[in-house]
Amino acid sequence: NPLVLPEGEHPAFYNTDTYDLISAASYSVYAASGEPVDQVCYVDPKIVKNLEGRAIKSGEFAFKLIQVANYNDTEGELISATTNDEFGMVDFDKANNVSGDLENPSCLAYTKPGTYYYRVIEDTSKGGMNDQSVLYSDQVITFTTVIEQDEATGQLVCTDMYYGWW
């Protein structure tokens, strides 16, 4: 059964690579209202970039969210590209809002059940990503969403979202 939270609360997932002392990812996942909107389910992935040794600057790091066929796929469809804010938050939905809702933007919209695979990569080709004092990450963050149709309501729901990195 899907997790049901009180209005305004959203589940958050965090992981940290303690070996390299780099916070790998933080995701917040939710549908904008929990109600069907023309049988579309929206999911809002986020990551957090941490920088050791000094304060992170807004726009200092660039990231790409790519939909792929599976985790071994290195090419795929670019869903969104954006940079971090002054707190390190990387908010793909603000860069490519497909929900039409400005208060609850989302960059992923699903119109049919299925399992969907994504990769998040740090894009060091962007301008400003050449600070010689910073060791840029080549880590790939992967995540999967599982979209199912609720038999009782017919509504599409994200029943599972999991992630990893390598």
Positions of the model-derived regions?
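Solvent-exposed loop/turn and edge beta-strand elements of beta-rich ligand-binding domains
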Residues: 1-166
